[in-house]
Structures are given as C-alpha cells and as structure tokens.
Amino acid sequence: VTHFFVQDKNSAELLKSIGFKNTTINGDSRFDSVLANTQNPVKIPLIEVFCKCKPTVICGSTWKKDELLLIRFIKENPQYNYIIAPHEMHHISYLQKQTGAQLFSTSNTENINSNNVLIIDSIGILANIYQYGKLAYIGGGFGVGIHNILEAVAFGLPIIFGPNHQKFNEAKELINQKGAISISNYKELNSAINVFSDFDKSIAINYI
C-alpha cells in the first residue's frame, strides 16, 4: 500500500501516529447522501398534518430498552407529539398497548390527531420523516450501538441516544458541539428533551 484514503482527520492522525504520512482525507459518503436528501426530501402529507399540532419527538429505530424510557416520558409529557419507528416490527403491538398509539398505515387526515403517538409500520420512510420533527431520539444505544443519526442531523434536529455510541465519531463530535446528548436513564432523558426544547437548528445543519 502506497497511499491511504481516509474518511476524517482522526483516521489520518491515527495513521500518522504509527508512521504513515501518505494519507488523504476523502470524506464520508454518508454525509453526501443525507445532505442530498435534504435538498429534495419526499413529502409525507399525513406526517406533516400530525406534526403541525404540537412539537414532535421523532423516535427512530428504537429497541425495547429505549422504548421503556420513552413510554414513561410519553405518558408524563402530553405537550409533545411522538412518532415511533421501532427497529423490530413485532414491538408494535406492545407500543400500542402502552401508549394507545395509532398506526401510520391505517391513519388518514381526519383521524391522524386523535392520539399524540403515531407508530410507523411502513419501511423506508423514516429518513424523510425527520424533516417534520422538533428533535430526535435514535435507538440502539442501550444495545450493540446507535443507529444512523445523520439522517436526523441533516434536517437540523438535536439528537438524543443511549450510552453505547463510542464507535461513532459523529456522535462524539455532536456531543462536543452541543448538538447531541447521551443518556443512560430516565432522569437524563427527561433533562435532555427539556434542554433541546429551544434548540438552534444551525448547530446540527452546520455539522453536515
């Protein structure tokens, strides 16, 4: 190998520390992809109607441990609307029982605001739902690791996630820039959402 193309400065510095100086920072194609999506996002009229009534917390790719915290917050904080896109579809019935949520697939503009919780039971639309949110909770941080946070960040949303995020440079960088908060319990979740209730979207947008 005569030359290394790397995604970021940290990778270049790591190679330099072990004697490899022939590096070029080539960027991360994930950033290009999410940025392109914000330029021409797919509109979802039903979601737009739902999110107009109250500030909306988008809960993307949630797992059971995420959902246990979120369900409590939802029950105690009716001042928000909530959209939940669970990672595992078999969690949907449990979430419905706990929150009284309606399903995206069976909702229409007449009944969409009959409940402040909407569950996404359709695949492939989450990335475009973020355009309507106030803030995002990204799941996976209480398990093997957080899911994609860049899709939400690109639309200017502040991000909340669980403690297992150390392998993701973007998560650590956004925490340092006050665009993300890592939480490990309900008290921290409650505090984080309150902190982000008045968020400057330029912090997230400028990161991308």
Regions found by a protein language model. Give the residues of each.
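Nucleotide-activated sugar donor-binding and catalytic core shared by glycosyltransferases
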Residues: 1-208
